[in-house]
């Protein structure tokens, strides 16, 4: 009997032990599940926050470009025959448009349902669909120059994201810094100083530091000429001929100019611009457009400068006005904006005088004035120079460049101006 009682006690003890282990295991499993759930919600919260910041940055960049369009429309369109008027404080005007969609308190139609405040509300609604309550307060919003082709928009935000299940919460105050490209937008300086008729789209020059190239140095004469070149000794009429030897070639003066290595036995007097260089055909193997400066003894490639000027591309400028300055109708970079960036914020383009002429509105084209935009539109009149080759372009031979702010060196035309 004692053995039976002892056996019963042992069985009860084993049963209780097993039961306890099962309870403990279930408790541990439940606790681990809870930990995993919390970890998942925290990770979801962090991912939500990162995605929210990305969305705020993207929306801020899109909205800023729309705000610039609204501001531009107010400085480019005249009313009742009056010339357009510049803005007073361009940075503050853009900040108002971005945040509230108004200009001096007046709603701008283009900003309807497109303000930063509106999109913040939309983002808050989207986070709720993912199980989070978010609250975003805009403390401040600033617009500054970043460099010559970008603006910097800084939105200081209070962000609170709360898990709707009460598991996790995040509270932060951050600055969303959005760098906004100006490319593809219109330059306000053009309409402001052409009674609203002129325009120019901002496109960064692809030729920075590579406007002209010196290809050959040699002996020559007979002034200079610009035109298409050729290595074809059978068809060089009205072209710049590049050849190794003049022997046997007739009608040399039918060419625009001649670049050759050896005169050979040809005794025909050359009346067109020419240059002699013993490696000419090697150094110029193809047939680009060339500026042959016979009297200067040099051959240049200047097509980059020509294309740049024809398209009125934009270049960084130490003294030219920034985009914000241009919205205010200024001809130089103001200290209030220059002090806000460590980069060059001024810009300049070459005015396409032919485009101004055909814009209409009886706008007077200043043929002898420099093509540098902020000087061209101003009352400043520094000495302006012609550039060899560009004075022979058809139909616009009126390209001029001043040497204010070192423009001759900047555009590599020091040996080409006169």
What do these predicted regions represent?
Residues 1-15:
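Glycine-centered recognition micro-motifs in short, flexible terminal segments and loops
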Residues 36-69:
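Membrane-proximal N-terminal amphipathic helix
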Residues 64-140:
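Post-signal peptide N-terminal segment of secreted/secretory-pathway proteins
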């Amino acid at each position: 009997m004692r053995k039976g009682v002892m056996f019963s006690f042992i069985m009860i003890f084993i049963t209780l032990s097993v039961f306890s282990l099962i309870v403990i295991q279930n408790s541990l499993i439940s606790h681990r599940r809870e930990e995993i759930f919390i970890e998942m919600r925290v990770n979801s919260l962090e991912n939500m926050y990162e995605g929210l910041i990305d969305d705020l940055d993207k929306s801020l960049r899109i909205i800023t470009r729309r705000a610039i369009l609204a501001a531009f429309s107010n400085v480019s369109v005249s009313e009742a025959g009056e010339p357009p008027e510049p803005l007073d404080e361009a940075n503050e005007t853009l900040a108002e448009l971005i945040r509230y969609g108004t200009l001096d308190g007046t709603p701008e139609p283009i900003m309807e349902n497109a303000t930063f405040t509106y999109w913040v509300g939309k983002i808050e609604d989207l986070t709720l669909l993912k199980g989070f309550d978010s609250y975003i307060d805009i403390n401040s919003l600033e617009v500054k120059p970043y460099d010559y082709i970008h603006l910097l928009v800084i939105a200081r935000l209070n962000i609170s994201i709360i898990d709707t299940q009460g598991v996790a919460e995040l509270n932060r105050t951050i600055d969303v810094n959005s760098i906004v490209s100006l490319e593809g937008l219109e330059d306000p300086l053009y309409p402001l100083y052409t009674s609203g008729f002129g325009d120019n789209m901002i496109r960064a020059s692809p030729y920075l530091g590579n406007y002209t190239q010196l290809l050959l140095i040699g002996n020559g004469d007979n002034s200079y000429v610009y035109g298409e070149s050729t290595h074809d000794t059978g068809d060089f009429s009205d072209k710049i001929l590049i050849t190794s030897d003049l022997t046997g070639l007739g009608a040399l003066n039918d060419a625009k100019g001649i670049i050759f290595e050896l005169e050979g036995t040809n005794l025909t007097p050359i009346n067109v611009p020419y240059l002699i260089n013993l490696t000419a055909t090697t150094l110029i193997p193809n047939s680009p457009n060339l500026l042959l400066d016979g009297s200067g003894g040099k051959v240049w490639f200047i097509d980059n400068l020509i294309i740049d000027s024809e398209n009125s591309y934009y270049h960084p400028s130490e003294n030219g006005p920034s985009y914000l300055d241009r919205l205010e109708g200024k001809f130089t970079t103001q200290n209030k904006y220059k002090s806000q960036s460590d980069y060059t914020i001024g810009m300049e383009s070459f005015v396409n005088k032919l485009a101004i002429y055909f814009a209409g509105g009886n706008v007077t084209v200043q043929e002898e004035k420099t093509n540098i935009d902020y000087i061209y539109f101003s009352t400043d009149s520094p000495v302006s120079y012609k550039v060899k080759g560009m004075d022979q372009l058809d139909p616009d031979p009126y390209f001029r460049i001043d040497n204010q702010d070192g423009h001759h060196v900047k555009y590599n035309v020091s040996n080409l101006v006169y």
